[in-house]
Amino acid sequence: MRHRSSGAHCILSCNHVLSQLNAARLGDEVLQPAPADGGVLPLSIIGGVLGWTPVAFGGVERNMTDAAIATCAPGQARSWVDGIGAITAVAPAIALGARVRKVGRATGLTSGIVTVVGASVRPNYAPLGFGQTPALFVNQIVAQIDCAYGDSGSLLVDEENRAVGLLFGGTRSGHTWFNPFDAVCAALDIALLDEDARREAPGTVS
């Protein structure tokens, strides 16, 4: 991803992954792989927290995104997902029944269909150790696709490899929740690395 305002190359994940659910400070070190996967200081540092979308708790105030970005070296940022390939664009919308895929840290490459658009969901972050009351998220995408702890931050794509959503939660019955990707990009002021170039090139469609 690219941060539009600064031009910085960055990685994208969830607020609760990169920013400790609103508790991070700008510039906090980000490790890849994470400590749970064998990452160690200082060898695994890839950058620092650049920004996040705050999550409001209490179940009344509405949230749209649980997302965050961190800086990285230009050569480390790619509009590419292993197992899926190049991400071609940001999908303007997604239809019920659309076939989608994602690659997650825990469950790998899985596919499914979109079952709800415009959903309201209340993820419970307490099992992740944050000890917060549930938060209300509106206008979310729900897909019948496998996920597990560790998959948060995965990118959901459609059959044209367009970015559809950012995985942030789900249920044990296989209903997985995604922030709409266009809302994530707008909230964090980010774009795919070559998105602007495609839009400006004559005769191209993005």
Region annotations inferred by a language model:
Residues A148-D151:
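Short, small/polar residue-rich loop motifs at catalytic or cofactor-binding pockets
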Residues M1-Q140, Q144, V157-E160, V164, ...:
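Serine endopeptidase catalytic core focused on the charge-relay Asp
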Residues L193-D196, A201-T204:
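Charge-biased, low-complexity intrinsically disordered regions
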Residues S173-C185:
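A short, polar/charged loop-to-alpha-helix boundary motif
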